[in-house]
Amino acid sequence: MKLSDFDFDLPERLIATRPARPRTAARLLLAEGDRIEDRHVRDLVGIFHPGDRLVLNNTRVIPARLVGTRTRGEACAKIEITLMEPAAAGGWRALAKPLRKLKEGETIRFSDALSAEVAEKGETDLRLVFDRAGEDFDAALAEAGAMPLPPYIAARRAPDAQDREDYQTVFARHAGAVAAPTASLHFDRPLLEALAANGVAFTEVTLHVGAGTFLPVKVEDVTTHRMHAEWGEVTEAAAAEIAATKAAGGRVIPVGTTALRLIESASAAGTIRPWRGETDIFIYPGYRFRVTDALMTNFHLPKSTLLMLVSALMGEARIRAIYDHAVRHDYRFFSYGDASLLIPGG
């Protein structure tokens, strides 16, 4: 299975740098079996069935992008930091730009209320230990940090105050992600309430999306690719809700690839169970889904592991046709773009 099998041409004009407003105004490509319909997210009330269960990732994105100053004698250097994940040894793993200007033991000052020491420096990243912890750290980070927009947006514009709302789901509650579960950005409270009134159930799980979600695949044989690990949890209550829906013949529909990867990780034994830990599950064509019946997701990058995931769900040829339709009909791509609802069979 070659990496080139998952390539496609995408006009740059289709890369969204701002989301649709309101959230539910985003377009929705409904693909069920061989059928494609051009709809909008607000139409989901008439698309989902009573008895369906949507699985939502309730992770909360932290303002992980920091700009600080390293002082060495009378010389000062501007340092850009992107937090990646909590480090096992304490502190945070982070990317630094320029990394070469930092030495272990040096301090980076981000604001009057927040500084960090370079505890370890590697070839590609470093470990920072901040001078605050707990709620004090959260408050200082909220003041000094900016939302960590994906590279394909950050290359086109800087993050601003509006991104603090736009790049966060309305049900975000557990802080720890450095990228949003973007399919969930399309939901607002009125849509959630309308779906619930129509008999659609919801289950929340937590997967802290890491910066590794944007890493490119560097091998031509995709089966040899190693996925980054991300921390997640499916509680006992969540597992029971999903199992009950399956037993009743309802559909389990993750909203986003992060929720899908998590519930499939929690179903390694064949049925879903409570689960907590790091997952590096890599889903590509040939994978047999255990609990997922359909998927709501945005449109993904060429040659990405997420494009491989949707190809596993729908079939490679079918996904090529779906993406060709999306490009021809000017759907907006990636994190702030439009959505698709992928339903195999039909």
Swiss-Prot record:
One of its GO terms (molecular function) is S-adenosylmethionine:tRNA ribosyltransferase-isomerase activity. It catalyses: 7-aminomethyl-7-carbaguanosine(34) in tRNA + S-adenosyl-L-methionine = epoxyqueuosine(34) in tRNA + adenine + L-methionine + 2 H(+). NCBIfam families: PRK00147.1, queA. One of its GO terms (cellular component) is cytoplasm. Keywords: Cytoplasm, Queuosine biosynthesis, S-adenosyl-L-methionine, Transferase. Pathway: tRNA modification; tRNA-queuosine biosynthesis. Its EC number is 2.4.99.17. InterPro entries: QueA (IPR003699), QueA_dom1 (IPR042118), QueA_dom2 (IPR042119), QueA_sf (IPR036100). It is found in: Cytoplasm. Its main location: cytoplasm. This is S-adenosylmethionine:tRNA ribosyltransferase-isomerase. It comes from Cereibacter sphaeroides (strain ATCC 17025 / ATH 2.4.3). Monomer. Pfam families: Queuosine_synth (PF02547). Belongs to the QueA family. GO terms for biological process: queuosine biosynthetic process; tRNA wobble guanine modification. Transfers and isomerizes the ribose moiety from AdoMet to the 7-aminomethyl group of 7-deazaguanine (preQ1-tRNA) to give epoxyqueuosine (oQ-tRNA).
